[in-house]
Amino acid sequence: MKTVLELKNVTKNIRGRTIIDDLSFTIREGEVFGFLGPNGAGKTTTIRMMVGLMKLSKGDVLICGQSITKEYAKAIKHIGAIVENPELYKFLSGYKNLQQFARMVKGVTKEKIDEVVELVGLTDRIHDKVKTYSLGMRQRLGLAQCLLHDPKVLILDEPTNGLDPAGIREIRDHLKKLTRERGMAVIVSSHLLSEMELMCDRIAILQKGKLIDIQNVKDENIDENDTYFFQVEQPSEAATVLNQYDLLSKTNGVEIKLAKEEVPAVIELLVMQQIRIYEVKVITKSLEDRFLEMTGETKEEVQHA
């Protein structure tokens, strides 16, 4: 897939303190890319530099190959962004808000406004005043504003903040639709691990302004040695039969750390001992597990971030 945004050694120093430390990575079209990290990790600061709201101390951001520092006007036209909360005129209707925003962008027609309204699912309420909108509807109206000029990259800072579960799901579904149907790159930041796992294709894990790692959220590749769970009828007997393996006994089976190629041999051993097997599955690490491993934080610290 084509690279649409690239960070090259991006650094931010404030009063002698390094807030963002030498970030470099690329983002591709058609993917939802997440910034994950606790509050204070540097997610919003990075986004502000990506959209030109904050100067870089070092490095550069390339948007569709154009430099945010040297060709700002050309680069920023490819971006649609909501940093923190969408700014809306609450005493105007949703439609009037979009008309106001359209005046700042060349070539936005009535048909285009109608198109984005339908895309974000606000057709039935677009002529109501924004002050009557729920928080989720305001987020969707902000999303519509961002889409009026057909950006290649959509950047959203904490897009699900304050939303109820239904509102979170709505936003998530709309973002996936944009990547799937329009090939847009969507960049989101959040400290909510469970939501990022559902929303993103890849994530960059930030901690104290540094890039810890970039991971595929739904990585189907099983590690060379992974943990497998064997649900059996006689767990204690199974543990005895398999005592040469690194295993952990459970009430309804055993967990064994082994290579994928060894699984058939383990099954054969159990069958030979007439131990009934009901299920064999790999125990995959959740995004939370991987995040905690890489950052060294506890579950309690993440939950209160």
Curated annotation (Swiss-Prot):
InterPro entries: AAA+_ATPase, ABC_transporter-like_ATP-bd, ABC_transporter-like_CS, P-loop_NTPase
Family annotation (SMART domains): AAA
Keywords on record: ATP-binding, Nucleotide-binding, Transport
Domain ABC transporter, chain residue ranges per copy: 5-233
Pfam families per UniProt: ABC_tran
PANTHER family, A to Z: ABC TRANSPORTER, ATP-BINDING PROTEIN
The family this protein is said to belong to: Belongs to the ABC transporter superfamily.
Protein's name according to its UniProt entry: Uncharacterized ABC transporter ATP-binding protein YhcH
Source organism phylogeny: Bacteria, Bacillati, Bacillota, Bacilli, Bacillales
